[in-house]
């Protein structure tokens, strides 16, 4: 039987579900992705059945990855109820701006399957003759038209209906007890599929829908319809590699690139490749400097919106993700996952070159540059290159003199956070690195590696000149300069000649740095205000007192060093001989006995010294200075210990006593000579 054709106007606006910004923010990422798929699929289906019009703004925004919310919220006042809509049906057809699409009854039902999220199981062969009544399963009532069959089927799938929704047929309302709209016998058109489409397309919903099968809540009916269709239908696009299925073939194609390794989008600047175009677009902003997302609080800009959202949590103080092990909180879930690996020891990122594993992907990326020899981060001041940006940033502070990291204990400042963290261990006594051979704990990993070499009992690095062996190559390099006479710098102000380049740089900074702060009492000038405060304490106050002996100090670091004499703590260990020291400067001076370094050279006679104190005393020979005077006889001396020994003559003190013959001595040297006489 030939069916009568009728026309209905269908525009994309009829199928569009709009969100305000507030509503959009309430959707989780899965719901947003679902909305995107629904809208793009509806638009594609309309185009496939002959819909021709310029691309709507919402589709353009979705394709560009932008948020599709509208400025003003729609209300039900923009849409008439079902009776008014039917009365104005002809007027809508006449004034509609979009192209009219013609359907037969059979084609209409089939196309509605595609347009409305594939929720109906009625195909072309599923449409019976008009002579045969249709049966609705829930109540067993007979229905006379296709429209009531379609409505009844939808009612069966979703029985929880918001009060504000009016897009239902008369028969479905009889099941649900809804009598909001009266049935008018004069309007026979209400039993046609035309009215069904109009019923469903002109509604706007304020209340969310609950879907009984999966428990999800949706704010718009179009999303609910598609969700039901996805749970009841098999996805035809399946990946042959991992059997994962996708609702769209384009999504499957992008997914398969993970297995094939295909990256068709190439950056014209650095030739880096990407699987999807959006990743390339985001990457290109690194080269162009474009940072379109700006923080309204601090005006900081970002390349992508996700980085901005994470940053904004800093201003709000919100740290939503807490570690169950240590209670530490994080702004991002990914940061928590990375942190948790520090508890589990998991290192999922492995280098294919050497097998070294890392807990973070960024660490692996930086490590791989060591194999390629790639150092992309270059200092504009000196041309030195680095593997990672953070190392370059720390290096640039050498040129600027900036030391933003300050120790709260001793006010010492550092170029980078890691150096400060290592320094703090000298105050806390923390030694997190344990030697597996002897169980000894050390402050830094580098110190542990250097210590483990001593267990091998082998000094691998030999000096070609004198045959001396060293455990470390760096120590050998410093030692060899004693033979070559290589000296990195001479500065007349201090008279120091440095064999170690780092020491030379330190001395240079000390001598050339501009002095900004001057002491009003002595005229002593220093480069930092904190140094001036410490200097003034030597005159007026000594606020730091030792609890053991009551001795006072003007600096907290000096007190810390002194307290080690009571605790016996000696944190500085020589890698060559294993000797330990309380203070770092003593440790540094001791190392020169192994390297042979003598950085302090006299300008008068050319004699050089390991220790600065010895050099200072030697200089007094040329200047004739004797600052230490005896109060008893007025005799003067160049060294303090010489004065101390001399004063024993006036006091009669003889502190050194022989255990064999009980003879006493004023000087230790004489006492040692005497003891040898007993051994002989």
Swiss-Prot record:
Stored SUPFAM superfamilies: beta-beta-alpha zinc fingers, KRAB domain (Kruppel-associated box)
Matching entries from SMART domains are given as: KRAB (SM00349), ZnF_C2H2 (SM00355)
Task: Give the organism, scientific name.
Answer: Homo sapiens (Human)
According to the entry, every stretch annotated as the KRAB domain falls at: 10-81
GO MF annotation list: DNA-binding transcription factor activity, RNA polymerase II-specific; RNA polymerase II cis-regulatory region sequence-specific DNA binding; zinc ion binding
Kindly give the PANTHER family that the UniProt entry links to this protein: ZINC FINGER PROTEIN, ZINC FINGER PROTEIN 345-RELATED
**Zinc finger annotations (C2H2-type) as residue ranges:** 237-259, 265-287, 293-315, 321-343, 349-371, 377-399, 405-427, 433-455, 461-483, 544-566, 572-594, 600-622, 628-650, 656-678
Q: Where are the transmembrane segments?
A: none
Task of the protein: May be involved in transcriptional regulation.
The protein here is known as Zinc finger protein 334
InterPro entries recorded for this chain? Answer: KRAB (IPR001909), KRAB_dom_sf (IPR036051), Znf_C2H2_sf (IPR036236), Znf_C2H2_type (IPR013087)
The family this protein is said to belong to? Belongs to the krueppel C2H2-type zinc-finger protein family.
Where would you find this protein in the cell? Nucleus
Which key words tag this protein in UniProt? Answer: DNA-binding, Metal-binding, Nucleus, Repeat, Transcription, Transcription regulation, Zinc, Zinc-finger
| An individual GO BP term | regulation of transcription by RNA polymerase II
Its encoding gene is what?
ZNF334
GO CC annotations? Answer: nucleus
């Amino acid at each position: 039987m030939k069916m009568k054709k009728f026309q209905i106007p269908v525009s994309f606006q009829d199928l569009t579900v709009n969100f305000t910004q507030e509503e959009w923010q309430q959707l989780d990422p899965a719901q947003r992705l679902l909305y995107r798929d629904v809208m793009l699929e509806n638009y594609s289906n309309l185009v496939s059945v002959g819909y021709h019009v310029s691309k709507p703004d919402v589709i353009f925004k979705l394709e560009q990855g932008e948020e599709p919310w509208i400025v003003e919220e729609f209300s039900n006042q923009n849409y008439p109820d079902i009776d008014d809509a039917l009365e104005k049906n002809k007027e809508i057809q006449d004034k509609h701006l979009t192209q009219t699409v013609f359907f037969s009854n059979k084609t209409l039902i089939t196309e509605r399957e595609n347009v409305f999220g594939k929720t109906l199981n009625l195909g072309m062969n599923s449409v019976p003759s008009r002579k045969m009544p249709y049966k609705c399963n829930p109540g067993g009532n007979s229905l006379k038209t296709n429209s009531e069959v379609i409505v009844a089927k939808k009612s069966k799938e979703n029985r929880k209906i918001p009060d504000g929704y009016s897009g239902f047929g008369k028969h479905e309302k009889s099941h649900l007890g809804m009598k909001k709209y009266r049935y008018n016998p004069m309007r026979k058109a209400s039993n046609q599929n035309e009215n069904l489409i109009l019923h469903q397309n002109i509604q706007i919903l304020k209340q969310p829908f609950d879907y009984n099968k999966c428990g999800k809540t949706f704010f718009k009916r179009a999303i609910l319809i598609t969700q039901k269709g996805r749970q009841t239908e098999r996805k035809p696009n399946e990946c042959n590699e991992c059997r994962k299925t996708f609702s769209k073939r384009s999504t499957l194609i992008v997914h398969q690139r993970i297995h094939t390794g295909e990256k068709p989008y190439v950056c014209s600047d650095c030739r880096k490749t990407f699987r999807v175009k959006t990743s390339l677009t985001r990457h290109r902003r690194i080269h162009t400097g474009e940072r379109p997302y700006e923080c309204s609080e601090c005006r900081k800009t970002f390349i992508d919106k996700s980085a901005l959202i994470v940053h904004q949590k800093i201003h709000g103080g919100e740290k939503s993700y807490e570690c169950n092990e240590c209670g530490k909180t994080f702004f991002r879930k990914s940061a928590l996952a990375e942190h948790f690996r520090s508890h589990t020891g998991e290192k999922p990122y492995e280098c294919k070159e050497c097998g070294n594993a890392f807990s973070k992907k960024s660490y692996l990326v930086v490590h791989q540059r060591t194999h390629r020899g790639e150092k992309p981060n270059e200092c504009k001041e000196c041309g030195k290159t680095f593997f990672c940006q953070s190392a370059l940033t720390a290096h640039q502070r050498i040129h600027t003199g900036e030391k933003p990291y300050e120790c709260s204990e001793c006010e010492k400042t550092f170029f980078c956070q890691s150096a400060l963290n290592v320094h703090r261990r000298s105050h806390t006594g923390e030694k997190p690195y344990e030697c597996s051979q002897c169980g000894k704990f050390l402050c830094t990993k580098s110190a542990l590696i250097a210590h483990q070499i001593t267990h091998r009992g082998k000094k691998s690095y030999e000096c070609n000149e004198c045959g001396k062996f060293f455990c470390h190559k760096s120590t050998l390099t410093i030692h060899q300069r004693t033979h070559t006479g290589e000296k990195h710098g001479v500065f007349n102000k201090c008279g120091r000649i440095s064999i170690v380049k780092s020491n030379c740089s330190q001395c240079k900074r000390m001598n050339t740095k501009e002095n900004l702060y001057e002491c009003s009492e002595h005229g002593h000038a220093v480069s930092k205000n904190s140094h001036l405060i410490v200097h003034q304490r030597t005159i007026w106050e000594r606020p730091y007192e030792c609890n053991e002996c009551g001795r006072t100090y003007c600096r907290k670091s000096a007190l810390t060093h002194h307290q080690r004499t009571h605790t016996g703590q000696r944190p500085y260990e020589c890698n060559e001989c294993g000797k330990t020291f309380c203070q770092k400067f003593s440790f540094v001076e001791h190392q020169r006995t192994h390297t042979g370094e003598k950085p302090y050279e006299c300008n008068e006679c050319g004699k050089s010294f390991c220790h600065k104190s010895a050099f200072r005393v030697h200089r007094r020979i040329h200047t004739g200075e004797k600052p230490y005077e005896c109060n008893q006889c007025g005799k003067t001396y160049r060294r303090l210990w010489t004065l101390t020994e001399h004063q024993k003559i006036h006091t009669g003190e003889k502190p050194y006593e022989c255990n064999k013959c009980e003879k006493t001595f004023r000087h230790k040297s004489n006492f040692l000579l005497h003891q040898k006489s007993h051994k002989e």
